[in-house]
Amino acid sequence: MDEKIAKLKEWIDGSDNIVFFGGAGVSTESGIPDFRSVDGLYNQQYKYPPETILSHTFFLSETEEFYRFYRAKMLALDAKPNAAHLKLAEWEREGKCRAVVTQNIDGLHQKAGSKEVLELHGSVLRNYCMRCRKPYPVEDIAKGTGIPRCSCGGIIKPDVVLYEEGLDSYTINKSVDYNSKADILIIGGTSLAVYPAAGLIDYYRGNKLVLVNKSPTPADRRADLVIHAPIGEVFSQL
């Protein structure tokens, strides 16, 4: 692994056009559970499967049950950025990293200092009234009970992409643009199992495709460099 990290460091040192594409594995080292690993959310037992609870239909029909799960399992407001988040913010300040494209909804990249963050699945930090669109901070959701309501009486919804909902087209198009122009594309902490997000790597045209993930992914065979290790552990050595 040392040789691979040395190679990655060499590439990074010589680049000013890095794009990072990350998933849940980036935040697990900050104590936020991922979805598909052995001890992830999908392998825990609930009254309903998480993918049912986190769906548009369930949100509308069982809003109180949705919020019970959401407050307990999706909000981690005390989580702190780890080595991966901090390194990416450092690269951005140095003019190396052009953008972070993330499937995560925890806001940790921004907390670490990254400015150009494209959140494919939204953010728990943003919430809005479904009737009048008034914005609400996440603290209002976290400290409340039951169904959060706006002063106008409307239901407040987190600005996250639920199952059955489409991704924001502006965010997708901007991500495609960054990926297609990148010198180095680093993919980290994702199983590349969720589409359309996982399909974004198809737009990369360079020859330095790097994959950093604890377990193998479907894209390993396409990558120019593959490191099977926790991403924070790898990035702390760069």
Ranges and model annotations:
Residues 1-238:
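Conserved catalytic core of sirtuin-type NAD+-dependent deacylases
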